[in-house]
From Swiss-Prot:
Acidic residues biased stretches: 193-211
Segments for region (Disordered): 188-291
Keyword line: Cytoplasm, Ribosome biogenesis
Biased composition regions of type Basic and acidic residues, renumbered to the chain: 212-237, 245-254
Name of one Pfam family that matches: RimP_N
Domain of life assignment: Bacteria
Function: Required for maturation of 30S ribosomal subunits.
Family, similarity comment: Belongs to the RimP family.
Keyword set includes Cytoplasm: yes
Protein name per Swiss-Prot or TrEMBL: Ribosome maturation factor RimP
One of the protein's GO biological processes: ribosomal small subunit assembly
Amino acid sequence: MNETVEALDPNEPRLITESGVAARIAAIVTPVLADLNLRLVRVKVTARDGGTCQIMAERPDGSMTIDDCEAASRAISPVLDVEDPITGAYRLEISSPGIDRPLVRLTDFDRWAGHEVKVEMAVPVDGRKRFRGILIGTRAELAVVKRTDAPKGEEPEVSLPVADIGEAKLVLTDALITEALRRAKAAERGLGEDEEFEDDADEVFEGDEADEKAAKDAANAERANAKKAADKAEKRAGKVARKAAKSEKAEKSQAKTGKARLSKAEVDDLAVTNPASRALRGGKPKAKETH
């Protein structure tokens, strides 16, 4: 099998972009990343962990190392401090696009053809906003997807204007993990757009199987951790609800007891002023003495 690493155009514009504060940050950091021979993939600002600004970037060959992330963080942080686009404290997070990466440029839809994708349109197509299926590639400025969620009798192939896409993201599968690792290995070897290496069916990169297993294990662990966190949150919510119910029950019981004590006190007061009322407490009034 022949493998090449396609060089990316560092100046290719993103067709899927941000809005609001994230758009302003994107405009600020794009030239900073370009000076580092990196290009912006996406900016996302969330309230997570007290405020997070996540910036995804990549090299012209599609890779992104830890050293790249550190260099980008050192370069971007002081610029954001000066421009101050975010109100309040926040945490800056620089990362690679990841295996299940967002697709933001026209060439992204060609480079990852053959893999499963989820698309959410900013502008509906045939009354639909969400699509899922196998990415076929592009025609002109349209992303072509063979839908796996198409109802029976409906045409599965759909052409989506890339400029009207709100978000497009690869779906994490075993095939995608294998391909992403293969490309990462090729990038490590410094293979350019026109360079190839032979990868026979019986020959694999040293450590590829272990790396692939580690990636799959990491993906499974991430899913397990998400489920564990959800279960923990559900248990915590149930515990809080039970505690609240118990507290409410105790308050009602206390109020009822207080009322009973008050009634008894009233009977006692009545008994002092009228001995005959002792019958109210289960006693009998004394007979009058005769002389």
